[in-house]
């Protein structure tokens, strides 16, 4: 029996409001995170991911109050990320009601933090978020590099090797965003999604670039992802979660 593939709406939150931009810029307001999360819960989303996109850049801690409000009204797994730098940050988020915590920039600067977090809280609640950009030129073997700070700072780290290292350190899941595709609505970067999914034994969530329901299906069928994440197609009413599930089922994908 194939494991069901998950559909995960993503809330990018800036100063307490859900926003969506193109390649992390040109931000437009999509509403109150708690109301939006409740709507997705009612629609049958498998999980919700809440990313405080101001936290790492401005050094602000994720709004625990918003997480508490959301967790009190949403009864599906909630992953929270943004500005997570210490074991205490993780403990605070889990205590506020998060089921999983996503570590991004801090993992790059201190990889052992991932191992410490997994040992302390269990791999099942530690997600490592990877922002990858293609750095190979035309005709070269495809290669992707890790970027931090909302895709602004290159690290020199190979994305596939980095993902494997994170798995070895105890990450329970990888949230993979293609910075080339983010907000562009022309589909996931299936090359990096497949390369990382095939290299790892833990689930990989594909993110960045969904513009239609076929893109979600392609993330699973061609990208080999365990879950697919999308934001704007759901926030602005183009598609509902039930429509996405029905479409994926029609493509032969097992959904919950």
From Swiss-Prot:
InterPro entries to which the protein is assigned, alphabetical: Aldolase_TIM, His_biosynth, HisF, IGPS_HisA/HisF, RibuloseP-bd_barrel
Compartments it resides in: Cytoplasm
One annotated GO molecular function: imidazoleglycerol-phosphate synthase activity
Enzymatic reactions: 5-[(5-phospho-1-deoxy-D-ribulos-1-ylimino)methylamino]-1-(5-phospho-beta-D-ribosyl)imidazole-4-carboxamide + L-glutamine = D-erythro-1-(imidazol-4-yl)glycerol 3-phosphate + 5-amino-1-(5-phospho-beta-D-ribosyl)imidazole-4-carboxamide + L-glutamate + H(+)
Cellular compartments per GO CC: cytoplasm
Gene3D superfamilies, alphabetized: Aldolase class I
GO biological process, one term: L-histidine biosynthetic process
The keyword Lipoprotein appears for this protein: no
Active-site residues from the entry: 12, 131
Class of the enzyme per the UniProt entry, highest EC level: lyase
Enzyme Commission code(s) on record: 4.3.2.10
Quaternary structure (record): Heterodimer of HisH and HisF.
Family listed: Belongs to the HisA/HisF family.
Function noted in UniProt: IGPS catalyzes the conversion of PRFAR and glutamine to IGP, AICAR and glutamate. The HisF subunit catalyzes the cyclization activity that produces IGP and AICAR from PRFAR using the ammonia provided by the HisH subunit.
NCBIfam families on file: hisF
Name of the protein this chain belongs to: Imidazole glycerol phosphate synthase subunit HisF
Gene name in the database record: hisF
